[in-house]
Amino acid sequence: MRAMRLVEIGKPLKLEDIPIPKPKGSQVLIKIEAAGVCHSDVHMRQGRFGNLRIVEDLGVKLPVTLGHEIAGRIEEVGDEVVGYSKGDLVAVNPWEGEGNCYYCRIGEEHLCDSPRWLGINYDGAYAEYVLVPHYKYLYKLRRLSAVEAAPLTCSGVTTYRAVRKASLDPSKTLVVIGAGGGLGTMAIQIAKAVSGATIIGVDVREEALEAAKRAGADYVINASSQDPVSEIRRITQGKGADAVIDLNNSEKTLSIYPYVLAKQGKYVMVGLFGADLKYHAPLITLNEVQFIGSLVGNQSDFLGIMSLAEAGKVKPMVTKTMKLEEANEAIDNLENFKAVGRQVLVP
């Protein structure tokens, strides 16, 4: 089968012909119909998440097939699989655990000590087929197409969990940093659907701000031409934001947006740009603010976002479908901040 693989750090993905895997036991072979392109794939190709090197520090073994936003049809199942059969259209939770560690036992499989992350340390969906380690990580699609569903498995899961951690309600104000991208537009939709909070979207390009508006943002701020701190203070009548979801965590965002938090505000950190957080420690105590890490999501988050999307309450803003062989172009678009919404590869 054709697969776009990371063979060498810092180099374009390479199209290779590799064997189609054979499922056994609880495994399922999926014929890919859609693979979303995530900013994590930029970091994978660069070979690092901030200062963490994917090979030396995170144990990723090359070559590996990228792509962790996955939807397709079941091609073949192992002999221990129940409830699924050939032809079923499914979305795949790529954040899988081995099942035995402490974190797996408490339902936080995505934090597994020996994770099985498709497209990271297991071969992923930038291919014609992908082998899923366990059928429990599948979700049967009823209303959604594969192209609509694929981005939900990362951008949807990630922002669903981040919104949960933001502890929102209709009285609260949420600021979304990076509001016009795939994660940003998803975060806005989810927050509106589950909380009714007032949402301020921040980005640096007008087309991204338009995407944030379409997703449901009540206010948008162009951080390249406006003072975001004063604008957020104005919108909130001086109170500040009850929560910030930072989808970048860059040096610039972390130097600005922690200071827009209201008392008891929550700063939910999602992005992996690799900057250091520098914040005047007494303010944490005096204002009772919290800095919260949020990494993708667990199986409960996966089922939650899929149910929400199947009910029509959120919809991925897929702006472009591309061929499998165009994976490098799609990653380039993300790396150079040219992508709006979500790009999806269709093998």
Swiss-Prot record:
Family matches, as InterPro entries: ADH-like_C (IPR013149), ADH-like_N (IPR013154), ADH_Zn_CS (IPR002328), GroES-like_sf (IPR011032), NAD(P)-bd_dom_sf (IPR036291), PKS_ER (IPR020843)
Cofactor: Zn(2+)
Keyword terms, alphabetized: Metal-binding, Methylation, NAD, Oxidoreductase, Zinc
Pfam families: ADH_N, ADH_zinc_N
Binding site for Zn(2+) 2: E98, C101, C104, C112
Catalyzed reaction equations: a primary alcohol + NAD(+) = an aldehyde + NADH + H(+); a secondary alcohol + NAD(+) = a ketone + NADH + H(+)
Positions carrying N6-methyllysine: K11, K213
Organism superkingdom: Archaea
EC number, UniProt record: 1.1.1.1
GO-annotated cellular components: cytoplasm
UniProt enzyme class: oxidoreductase
Family: Belongs to the zinc-containing alcohol dehydrogenase family.
Name this protein carries in UniProt: NAD-dependent alcohol dehydrogenase
Species this chain originates from: Sulfurisphaera tokodaii (strain DSM 16993 / JCM 10545 / NBRC 100140 / 7) (Sulfolobus tokodaii)
